[in-house]
Amino acid sequence: TLVLKQDGTLFTAFDNLRHANIDTMAQVKVFRPDPLTPLNQVYGGIYIDNNDANAPWMNAEYWMDSIRVRYDTGTGLFYPENELVKIDDIESPTAAPVTPAVPAFLYDRSQSGFEDINALYHITRFHDYISSLGYDSLMNLQVVVDTHAQFGADNSVFNRNGGNPTICYGTGGVDDAEDADVIIHEYCHGVSWSANNNGNFSTERSALDEGLADYFATSYSRSINVNRW
């Protein structure tokens, strides 16, 4: 839209184009459920975080798959976002979501984009599964997720946020968004909340909520682990 002065010269201009946001499939590289479980290894020795560094032994533990993401025809970029999850930067440390120009989120754990797509992948898969069982009303909304959050603390949290839920995954120790157990545990607090809004405030209910979140997270991780342990 052009706004002209009385003499016919340009005063200002507005871009009124409305660019479509299109869901599409993108190739992703993730852990299933983490790099140690498929190896039947415990944390220690060479199997440590090492300040987010990638390691040769990890290369075989990345899984290639595909998941729904958003393509913006205006920017020509792909965003780690779909109808269920939106990766965003809510808390410190600052890490803007990755936005590649091709439908491929192929990062390793030394890059911030890995946690972004790892969280989106597992939350989407888990929600798709419970929806297939007929519970499609649970968390039938878009949760905003920060995969580098909690001000660097070794902690993660689901926040009801007045009906606009968020999940913040901490980066202390091993980044929590690298581990499907933690990803799904926090998301399941949202599932419980959506099943009974405002009903999980009491101490007893909160304790039960933690147990349920652990159960579903463990069940999910076992289901995607080739060794089933």
What are these regions (language model features)?
Residues 1-183, 190-229:
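Zymogen propeptides/activation segments of proteases
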